[in-house]
Amino acid sequence: MTGPIFDTHAHYSAHAFDADRFALLDSLPAKGVVGVCEQATHSGDTPRVLELAHRYPWVVAAIGIHPESLLAPEDCGADGPAPTVSVYGGDWAAEMRALAPYYDDPKVVAVGECGLDYHWPVPKDAQLALFEAEIRLALELDKPIIVHDRNAHADVYALLKRYQPKGIVHCYSGSADDALWLAKQGLYFGFGGACTFKGAKRAAKAIAALPLEQLVLETDCPYMAPEPVRGTRCDSSLIRYVGEYIAQVKGVSTEEVFRQTAENARRVYQL
């Protein structure tokens, strides 16, 4: 059995798991999974996320507003993300008010997934205002923040430098140099299947440069299954391939990678 595996970033509430969600989750502990942080991205999926967190003692939750949730439905297209916030029509302030009561739930350990995504046609001013508000909320609640950063390094880093929240930079895709100064602020760095893809040289350099004590493992499941199963539906058991890759890059045993990253996850989530 591989492990201990702590998946710091999962989306088991996604429709891709509708057919076998509970059977799959029931099977994970036997595969070495000791923890999962299930991520909400808006008020619509938060009840489903919390249902999972309360059903399984080893599942915790992060509650926030993903930047894609500000997309208008007509901007999504067949190949784009699903329009996730329709309840409030992209009104992020109303969305935050709707989420506020959930942060009192003891299973909610972080604010997120939130951040900036400049790949999709979401107005930057709205994204920046929302992300800043969520950082301030995380500081107020004394909870870590789960940072989404896609094609937005400079603006994400500027806000992280200004406010210096604790938390995880999800699916880290920046340079090794940037990772090192972010690490000095106490941030952790999530690596998942994407770091195993051919050509992921920046990820390899960042992994090599960072101390193992500031790395955490993640899937972003059902997305980003690692090599050699890329293109399939991902789940937390497949983190074993990510752990093996990181062990190879850092020249340590896979057992040490799993042990230390699970310890890191518990530390950042204050478990």
Enumerate the language-model features and the residues they cover.
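Mid-domain alpha/beta scaffold segments of enzyme catalytic cores
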Residues: 1-271
